């Protein structure tokens, strides 16, 4: 439902029958990571709000030398202070997606509201999604647009992208393809795959920008390389049709 997208790479299969030779440099790097994780854990246990959130993220995604453990991540996020917007947001993400706790969309929405009160851009964006879909609150597209705009003004790429979608379809705001394309372009510059794809659509069909199939192809390729399925499909269609590129069914 939310804009939350995991960004970690899945670790290799530990049962993979291969011989791994660690160089002294890699061993030193591993030691530094372990020490950094221990320092972060100690700071979190001492009450450092940023460290608490970082430990939660480490455990949620299996990054920073921590093992992936959603339940432990939830416990860390639960220790955040009631006035910490980042911690409240991540706790909301856990409830929203069922990470380490039973899914509770209403609770997630309330946490996003508390976090958004501190103008935390990711929470503003997710709260906008709640109002757009009617999750935990009465559906209100105008309110969703307002929240997406505030998130966009805070420089949050998904806020910019979602605002662009509202302009593109005229939901909660007057339809304006030029403003939609502008929002997509802002988010695409921040390398958001969804925005790269949507800007590519605008370029392919001339929606809000001058039609430019070559640019659309480049945008689709960037988003596809990042694993965005719709972009991979669009890229395949262009190769199949030979639009902006030599026709190539094998590449499609």
Residue ranges and their predicted role:
Residues 26-34, 67-71, 104-105, 140-141, ...:
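Helix-turn-helix repeat elements of alpha-solenoid scaffolds
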Residues 45-49, 61-63, 82-85, 97-99, ...:
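Short helix-capping/linker turns of helical repeat alpha-solenoids
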Residues 6-61:
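N-terminal segments that cap or nucleate solenoid repeat domains
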Residues 54-61, 66, 88-97, 101, ...:
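Hydrophobic face of amphipathic alpha-helices that form TPR/SEL1-like repeat modules
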């Amino acid at each position: 439902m939310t804009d939350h997208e995991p960004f970690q790479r899945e670790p290799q299969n530990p049962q993979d029958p291969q011989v791994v030779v660690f160089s002294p440099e890699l061993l030193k790097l591993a030691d530094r990571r372990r020490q950094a994780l221990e320092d972060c854990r100690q700071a979190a246990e001492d009450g450092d709000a940023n460290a608490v959130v970082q430990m939660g993220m480490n455990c949620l995604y299996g990054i920073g030398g921590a093992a992936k453990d959603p339940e432990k991540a939830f416990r860390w996020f639960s220790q955040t202070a009631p006035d910490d917007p980042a911690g409240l947001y991540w706790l909301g993400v856990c409830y929203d997606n069922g990470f380490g706790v039973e899914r509770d969309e209403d609770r997630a929405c309330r946490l996003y509201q508390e976090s958004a009160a501190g103008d935390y851009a990711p929470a503003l964006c997710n709260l906008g999604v709640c109002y757009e879909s009617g999750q935990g609150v009465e559906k209100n597209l105008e309110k969703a647009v307002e929240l997406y705009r505030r998130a966009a003004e805070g420089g949050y790429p998904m806020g910019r992208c979602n605002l662009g979608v509202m302009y593109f379809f005229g939901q909660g705001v007057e339809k304006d393809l030029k403003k939609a394309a502008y929002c997509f372009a802002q988010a695409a510059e921040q390398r958001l795959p969804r925005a790269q794809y949507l800007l590519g659509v605008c370029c392919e069909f001339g929606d809000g920008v001058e039609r430019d199939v070559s640019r659309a192809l480049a945008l689709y390729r960037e988003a596809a390389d990042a694993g965005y399925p719709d972009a991979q499909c669009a890229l395949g269609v262009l190769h199949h049709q030979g639009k902006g590129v030599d026709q190539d069914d094998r590449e499609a």
